[in-house]
Amino acid sequence: MKTYIETNKERFFEELFSLLRIPSVSSLEQHKPDMQRCAERLVELLLEAGADEAAVYPTTGHPVVFGQKLIDPSLPTVLVYGHYDVQPVDPIELWHSDPFEPEIRDGAIYARGANDDKGQLFMHIKAFEFMVREGGLKHNVKFILEGEEEIGSPSLAAWAKENKDMLAADIILVSDTTMISESVPSINCGMRGLSYVEVKVTGPNKDLHSGHYGGAVANPINVLCDMISSLIDKDGHITVKGFYDDVVELSDEDRAKLSRAPFDLEEYKEFLDIKEIKGEAGYSTLERTGIRPCLDVNGIWGGYTGEGAKTVLPSVAHAKISMRLVPNQDSETITRLFTEHFLSIAPDYVKVEVIPHHGGDGFLIPISSPAYKAAEKAMTEVYGIEPVPSRGGGSIPILADLQRILEIDPLLMGFGLERDTIHSPNESYLLKQLFAGMEAIALFYRYY
């Protein structure tokens, strides 16, 4: 694969850049034509790589790309999942180059989607291409590439149910996560789920003069802050009744395996420019961000936030809250429990609403599975060191849906790094990670 990469490197850049130049931002209506254009370009790349068939399939939202190459029904089938939609680029003024005009500098590609997830799904197309052209492919390979991952995949689960037979496979292979570091590879054997809600606290029927009414009328922002502060106690435990009922404690053996991941607390604090860490008592930082649930306020607003001063007592206050969940916690159940709890602590002098948004369940895969062992062997060969099994703190809710619908496990071979700043300005992807990913994926097919 190394020789194939070196020989075709310039073509690879040209093809990947053709994807990165398409502003496939799924959350913005004005980019709907770009979503279709990106899907059609992926079909071209799959067919050129050696797929027997590939097509764009409509959904209730943005389209899905499906392609496949069937060698022999008796052989194992790998279903490659990826997403071609990207995050918005705001704030655009912080980018050092045009987010949709990819540049190579300092050994990395800079563009929106360079890592998440166009760069990583492109690795799969090229590894597949290599295996087909070199005659080494001994698997049936299917691709399912969606355009709604960044907005919670609202259409894919229903589409997958309707096309379950077409998607039948033995494993879901995914590259949409990070490694521990450039020198320490890891295989993600689980991810957290998500419950996302918006809360609204309403007081008086209009904004009031704080001099005339302050001290006599409840301020919705003050009330909201009090309610939010009560959601987590001094030990970092979430106070929502029933929140932890389905959380399964990890065994000492599993905690020991996860602790193999190198972690320097002082480096961590320096990187974030913070003096101390804070979280749930009794757990390490890696455990808090991987195997334990958490609750965070993602945004809070109300009243006057413009330039200068305006002394109002606001009528309404809002907040958006995410809860990261661990496997065995049900997203819909947690959303219901949160709603019941938040309404129960609301004082009677304000009106409180909870508006559920998207969510999804977490998942785990056994590290004893043949697919995990094949990935472990492949990454060891590429990096010269055995990968560490890790648990992702983020969420890809659709993977739990696909796991349930198709009755197969996902395997996450991610090659991104924290330095890639996905979802932020100046997203990038190291060339050596791009090429190492191609090598490792090709080796996965050899060993699986």
Region annotations inferred by a language model:
Residues 186-202, 411-413:
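Flexible glycine/proline-rich, aromatic-decorated loop/lid segments
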Residues 115, 205-207, 323-330, 360:
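A generic structural motif
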Residues 84-86, 144-153, 175-179, 203-205, ...:
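Acidic, glycine-rich active-site loops and adjacent beta-strand->loop/helix elements
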